[in-house]
Amino acid sequence: MTLYSPEFSESEQSKIDAEFSRLTENKSVYLDHAGTTLYAESQVKAAAEQLQRNVICNPHTCRLTGDFVDQVRYKVLEFFNTTSEDYHVIFTANATASLSLVAENFDFGSFGNFHFCQENHTSVLGMRERVSHAKGIYMLTEREITGCSLQNGSSKEKPTDPGRSLVTFSAQCNFSGYKIPLDAIGNIQENGLHTPGKHIWGTEGKTSNNDYYICLDAASFVATNPLDLKRYRPDFVCLSFYKIFGYPTGVGALLVSKRGAEAFRDRKFFGGGTINYAYPHTMEYQLRESFHQRYEDGTLPFLAIVGLLEGFRTLERIVPKTKELATMERISRHVHGLAKYLEDQLKQLKHPNGEPLIQLYNKAGYQDRTRQGGIVAFNVRTDSGDYVGFGEIACVAALHGILLRTGCFCNIGACQYYLGLDGDAMDAIYKRAGRICGDYFDLIDGQPTGAVRVSFGYMTTIHDVEELLKMLRSSYLATKPQQRILFIEEQAGQLPPVLQKRVQNLRPKLLQMAIFPVKSCAAFKIEGYLKSWPLTDQGLKYDREWMIVDMNGMALTQKRCTELCLIRPLIKNDVLELHFGDSCVSVPLSLEDQAADSAKCVSKVCRQPVEGLDCGERVAEWLSTNLGQDGLRLLRQSGQRNSSKDQQKLSLVNQAQFLLVNRSSVRSLQFEEPLDDTVDRFRANIIIDTGLAFEELSFKQLSIGKVQFQVQGPCQRCDMICINQKTGERSPETLTTISRLQSGRMRFGIYITRISKDTGDLQLSCGDTVLVE
């Protein structure tokens, strides 16, 4: 077990706590320092006093303002242990603007390529749209940057092509906190890349004989870690100051090495302050001599830049350096210690059955501070291994006063890597399901589309970590899902508006309906353009109203004829169409039209006699031909049939009006076939997803939309579920798996019956809320 060892002394911690007393006053636990850290009270007070003391105006007007800006420029270089001899400082709006500036101005030459790491911020992906002048664009994995770059001492081909390649990666992943070893910077600059990565755009070709330049996205890293630019010399460094100081916002920087400056091409645009002169009557102009002035278009955000001085001073005052450690080194040790402690505690959270509560996402573990920062990403799982949506976690955390981040954190590539999403899964999430960045669409078929992230700053305390652990234990180890949902719904008014919308989706929904017009044949699914379906006093309209009988009048089922599942029904234009391969036949839906010239017959369903109308010779011949059995007939139920148990009205179903299946229970079977195919095996009318496997077995009553249902009991399964409903092939593992999971009992799904006797115009609709009573 990891014991927490504080980095700060008691007196230092007391001073820090005093700077952030608003957290205690507001009963808030702030755990999103990777989003932004918090500003100290004395910091903003000193910044305001500075504005009150001085006349700070446009730097083109006032020399004092220019001196302040130069002071900050010097302080930035000092903060990163470098000087103006080696780096230029260009002030930008933020790290994103810095990345954009590099993409727009980097000169790739004729054969240069753009390489970026998969686990990068969205802004790096945005660079691809600005580097169309590169020959090709390649995506690198972290391993291809660190493990597969050529080893030191090996020799790269001497550049022969007029090409410069740009490699962009994050010093610290803002999703997981993983740190790419910064030795990769010099290694790639000197030796190039052993493999270019996955080619995704442009011309694919040989790249090893280019000069290589490094663009380091340092926004997440420098917030809590020292970056020594004398030791590591990336060509471009992008950052946002609010990540470090919390205040001010709206100002970032691009640090450009002297080598990097030589790789910038001539600008296609200039703004105020970037030129010595520009003639209006000709195209002649002359850029400033100073490199940074050429790229700082217009008036700088000078008030924000001046405010950075107090950011540097406050940080050094609140977290003073020691004989051995500088300020940022101490902050790095502090946040890593908290993350290491939290990770260890999360690993110990177990459900009563021993299943882990937490799924962690990291690469290197938390033992080595040079490889892992103060970020912990995770998802919560149930005792059956199902995932809890991150939207629910966000709601529960907010109601406990905990501010954290959920989703993909503007890093879809890291999401893809850590969640194991291939291209098809990405399409299912973003194209077919319609998820967008920043929403709370957290689960698709039980699989997470994002994660929960907590991240630490120098003002984070061990108490904050314990509050998070307390919330997870009380909400996910000591309560049932229905209790948790009820708690959230009762307190929903206290949530921010964006989370209030998520509360509306916490309850399970009716995902899909299916009717089986012909008993034992394929389903007609209510989905897509068909969102709703009417109810009758027997169940869903047209469900199991027809059945096929043999020459002896006995009902034909898949137990005797598996090919029945290949007969596909289609209801349209007042007829029931039956399809088998390319062959089709139809019968009228209207019972009056059917009864006009039909003979009455009697058959049996579950030992009960049922009256039916013969549907005629044409459909009989069609069935016999396609199924290869003589004497088959299609009958339609005409007489009333009641349950022997409670006199409920039934169609040709075996036992109850409706059969409900929970997709979470289906997922627990873990078959290799597509989930939808496994769901189809159970031939249910109503498909929901509660997020908890076999939770439906505890239901007594439930409502779907406005319709109330009584649970009749579990469905006892036979070997018919071993039949693949798409192919008709048998596979015994379905039944054996259920038997194993249910301790020898063959139960899967539940029978339900509508409580209200009033039919009216009742209907069920996909998307209806499922409320367990």
Curated annotation (Swiss-Prot):
Pfam families: Aminotran_5 (PF00266), MOSC (PF03473), MOSC_N (PF03476). Belongs to the class-V pyridoxal-phosphate-dependent aminotransferase family. MOCOS subfamily. GO terms for molecular function: lyase activity; molybdenum cofactor sulfurtransferase activity; molybdenum ion binding; pyridoxal phosphate binding. PROSITE patterns: MOSC (PS51340). The modification N6-(pyridoxal phosphate)lysine is found at residue 243. It catalyses: Mo-molybdopterin + L-cysteine + AH2 = thio-Mo-molybdopterin + L-alanine + A + H2O. InterPro entries: Aminotrans_V_dom, MoCF_Sase_C, MoCo_sulfurase, MOCOS_middle, PyrdxlP-dep_Trfase, PyrdxlP-dep_Trfase_major, PyrdxlP-dep_Trfase_small, Pyrv_Knase-like_insert_dom_sf. The modification Phosphoserine is found at residue 731. Keywords: Molybdenum cofactor biosynthesis, Phosphoprotein, Pyridoxal phosphate, Transferase. Sulfurates the molybdenum cofactor. Sulfation of molybdenum is essential for xanthine dehydrogenase (XDH) and aldehyde oxidase (ADO) enzymes in which molybdenum cofactor is liganded by 1 oxygen and 1 sulfur atom in active form. Residues 632-773 form the MOSC domain. Its EC number is 2.8.1.9. Its cofactor is pyridoxal 5'-phosphate. The active site is at residue 410. This is Molybdenum cofactor sulfurase. Pathway: Cofactor biosynthesis; molybdopterin biosynthesis. The gene is mal. GO terms for biological process: Mo-molybdopterin cofactor biosynthetic process; molybdopterin cofactor metabolic process. SUPFAM superfamilies: MOSC N-terminal domain-like, PK beta-barrel domain-like, PLP-dependent transferases.
